[in-house]
Amino acid sequence: MKKITLIALILAFFTTFGNAAEVNVFSARHYDSDIQLYEKFTAKTGIKVNVISGKDKALQKRIVEEGADSKADIYITADAGRLGAFDAKGMFQNSMTPVIKSAVPKNFRSTNWTGIAK
């Protein structure tokens, strides 16, 4: 996937938050490239990205325990198996956008999650 496509995809995710002044990303990933994408997003939109980092199990447990009061807007993991299992629990909402639909092959997305890579 080209870098521009990934940036557009990340923007597509985040722009679903409308006029939000900030977005909370719960991330089990620890890559410098992720931080660079968040910084580019903030520079382009003015929306602050708050990153809450942790291990998959701990982040998922927190999201489940907080329920509807969860501060998580986006959950990112490097483990597709955990992603699928979390989706099966009904923990995600529909995130399909026209940008995602056109940029991401069907086998790397569902209506509730999308796989990304750099």
Locate predicted features.
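Bacterial N-terminal signal peptides
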Residues: 5-16
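Residues in and immediately flanking transmembrane alpha helices
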Residues: 15-16, 63, 86, 92
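A broad, low-specificity signal marking well-ordered, structured residues that form hydrophobic/aromatic
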Residues: 18, 23, 93
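Early extracytoplasmic/lumenal segment of secretory-pathway proteins
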Residues: 21-85
